[in-house]
């Protein structure tokens, strides 16, 4: 069993017998139609694209109600195209890993072309220019990570041949401008708040610079700023897509699926002819398009207005997912866990995050109306976090914790203040914040050192807790005032809102020698 069997029409009964779902549409007909009249180009050929946007389109094509595929362009790691797309005729296998242990296997055939988005690849770049000049093009989208929207001064000086993704996209938009000021929607699908604004500011920066340098007419800047022509909608995306997993690889090999190996590029991208991902997924997009759009609602995309996208993002980041992640990362590291799914079997940690979410954060949740916060958090706690197939680690989530606490917990505390709610009801959120001081010591609950995850403020914050020792007995905890009064870290001065002393008291318990983290966690979770 190989992906090439699909193109060759050499499909044995094994595919169906072993539970592989095959395309229900005419792959070659869709490819021909897309080549002639492309509607969607996606930048970023990584695992999340194949597991989510491409899979959504695959569902739309399977419905028989749509007839165009997606063209993928890679602007950073060109080996992905050479090694994970073109040898397999742009087909891939999506392995959906469910928390029940069930596995879904689907061949994704919605990607009709794969291109290297750089001038040095002459034919590919010429094809991208041709696509951008075609009136049929409706949307370009991105999964290039938040860093991909960066603008470097040196790149702005390169003129019309920039090397960064946003510069290349702006150059292609200039081709569309020259073809008749054709409309287009520029859609970020990356996991960052107000993502459309990040693309917008980058494109505007390049266009402004080029006008200033006399490389393009002022009308081009007006074109990318005209929302009847070019729009930059916001979106909220949520799906975990880890690198190819060895257990999945073994399972596919046992099935007789031969395209089961991992590919590691020179730029250290981990990819494969298959992609493994969790079952739960959300993609909510601001419905602001200037030239029509693919009907991705057929694959489960939720279209709404900008305010609703923002509310969904806040629901996720401030209440229903991210705060639980951070609580598990801080305490998971101190308790010696290396897998989030394993933490969910812990008799203290599971109720810890349940009570943080349902009892303490949910009273001030931002309800977007189109997604039920209780259903969302229920999926997180009961399906997503316990999923044994998701090799997510508390150590990964603990990265940059100082940059996350304000939005993940500070916003809830502010909401209690603004609504006049009784902050004495906050017990486990303060325990998370007390745990952060203990975490900064880099000593686990057995008294052994552990490696603290990278963080831009790590040295600075560790210096604050340096006088404290992880040991029983009296010590002066007054140094913690310098930590818990920092609004840049917590979003509020925790003393000013009446929580500083409570958190200090909890920290004293957590520092009381080996076993104190477990004992303190158990005490407060049980009491709550």
Please name every model-derived segment.
Residues 1-43, 47-528:
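Substrate/ligand-engaging "lid" and interaction regions
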């Amino acid at each position: 069993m190989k992906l090439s069997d699909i193109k060759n029409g050499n499909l044995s009964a094994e595919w169906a017998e072993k539970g592989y779902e095959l395309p229900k549409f005419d792959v070659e007909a869709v490819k021909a139609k897309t080549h002639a009249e492309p509607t969607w180009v996606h930048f970023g050929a990584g695992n999340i694209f194949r597991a989510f946007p491409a899979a959504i389109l695959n569902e739309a094509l399977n419905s028989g109600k749509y007839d165009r595929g997606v063209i993928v362009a890679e602007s950073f790691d060109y080996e992905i195209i050479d090694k994970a797309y073109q040898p397999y005729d742009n087909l891939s296998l999506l392995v959906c890993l469910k928390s029940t242990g069930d596995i879904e296997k689907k061949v994704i055939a919605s990607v009709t072309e794969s291109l290297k988005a750089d001038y040095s690849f002459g034919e590919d770049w010429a094809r991208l220019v041709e696509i951008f000049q075609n009136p049929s093009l409706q949307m370009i989208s991105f999964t290039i990570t938040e860093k991909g929207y960066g603008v470097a001064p040196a790149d702005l000086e390169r003129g019309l041949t920039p090397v960064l993704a946003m510069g290349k996209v702006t150059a292609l938009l200039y081709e569309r401008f020259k073809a008749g000021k054709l409309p287009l929607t520029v859609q970020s699908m990356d996991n960052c708040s107000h993502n459309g604004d990040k693309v917008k500011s980058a494109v505007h920066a390049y266009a402004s610079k080029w006008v200033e340098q006399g490389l393009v007419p002022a009308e081009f800047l007006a074109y990318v700023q005209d929302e009847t022509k070019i729009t930059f909608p916001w979106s909220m995306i949520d799906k975990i897509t880890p690198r190819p997993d060895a257990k999945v690889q073994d399972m596919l090999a046992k099935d007789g699926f031969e395209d089961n190996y991992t590919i590691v590029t020179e730029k250290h991208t981990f990819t494969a002819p298959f992609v493994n991902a969790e079952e739960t997924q959300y993609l909510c997009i601001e419905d602001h398009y200037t030239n029509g759009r693919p009907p991705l609602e057929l694959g489960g995309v939720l279209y709404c207005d900008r305010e609703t996208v923002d509310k969904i993002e806040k629901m996720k980041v401030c209440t229903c997912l991210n705060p639980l992640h951070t609580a598990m990362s801080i305490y998971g590291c101190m308790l010696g866990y290396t897998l989030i799914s394993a933490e969910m079997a812990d008799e203290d940690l599971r109720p810890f995050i349940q009570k943080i979410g349902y009892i303490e954060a949910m009273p001030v949740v931002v309800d977007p109306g189109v997604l039920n916060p209780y259903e969302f958090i229920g999926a997180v706690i009961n399906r997503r976090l316990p999923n044994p197939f998701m090799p997510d680690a508390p150590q990964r989530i603990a990265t940059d914790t100082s940059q996350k606490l304000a939005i993940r917990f500070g916003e809830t505390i502010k909401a209690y203040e603004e609504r006049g709610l009784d902050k004495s009801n906050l017990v486990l959120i303060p325990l998370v914040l007390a745990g952060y001081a203990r975490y900064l010591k880099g000593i686990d609950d057995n008294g052994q050192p552990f490696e603290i995850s990278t963080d831009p403020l790590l040295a600075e914050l560790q210096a604050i807790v340096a006088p404290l020792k992880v040991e029983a007995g009296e010590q002066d905890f007054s140094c913690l005032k310098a930590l818990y009064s920092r609004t840049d870290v917590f979003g509020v001065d925790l003393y000013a809102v009446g929580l500083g002393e409570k958190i200090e008291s909890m920290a004293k318990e957590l520092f009381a020698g080996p076993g104190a983290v477990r004992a303190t966690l158990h005490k407060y979770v049980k009491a709550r």
